[in-house]
């Protein structure tokens, strides 16, 4: 009962804060705030640079695979099984899933820089 009450209070408080932030925005736009700042000089070109989508996808793929490897490293201690075969099968299945994901990215040319 205490956990349900705590969850109800947390959800209610979260919804109140989200709605408050949504309905009471600070919209004080004036010329100094809207102009780009570049060390006191007028900007020579646009401040927005084009972003490579390929670089973004390769970076996201790297982060996902890196996170999965970080979760895979403590696996033998997390399983705590005296049976070595079970630990090996679980580890190999996770590595196989990672390898399948990497091969899928590779076959769909998600890891190539040039087109």
Curated annotation (Swiss-Prot):
Quaternary context:
Core subunit of respiratory chain NADH dehydrogenase (Complex I) which is composed of 45 different subunits. Interacts with TMEM186. Interacts with TMEM242.
Q: What does this protein do?
A: Core subunit of the mitochondrial membrane respiratory chain NADH dehydrogenase (Complex I) which catalyzes electron transfer from NADH through the respiratory chain, using ubiquinone as an electron acceptor. Essential for the catalytic activity of complex I.
User: Which reaction is the catalytic activity of this chain?
Assistant: a ubiquinone + NADH + 5 H(+)(in) = a ubiquinol + NAD(+) + 4 H(+)(out)
- Taxonomic path: Eukaryota, Metazoa, Chordata, Craniata, Vertebrata
Chief subcellular location: mitochondrion
Alphabetical GO biological process terms: mitochondrial electron transport, NADH to ubiquinone
Keyword entries, A-Z? Electron transport, Membrane, Mitochondrion, Mitochondrion inner membrane, NAD, Respiratory chain, Translocase, Transmembrane, Transmembrane helix, Transport, Ubiquinone
Q: What is its EC number?
A: 7.1.1.2
Instruction: State the compartments where it is located.
Output: Mitochondrion inner membrane
Would the keyword Transmembrane helix turn up in this protein's UniProt record? Answer: yes
Record protein name field: NADH-ubiquinone oxidoreductase chain 3
Q: What class of enzyme is it?
A: translocase
**Which InterPro entries does its entry note?**
NADH_UbQ/plastoQ_OxRdtase_su3, NDAH_ubi_oxred_su3_sf
Q: How does it sit in the membrane?
A: Multi-pass membrane protein
Spans through the membrane? 4-24, 55-75, 84-104
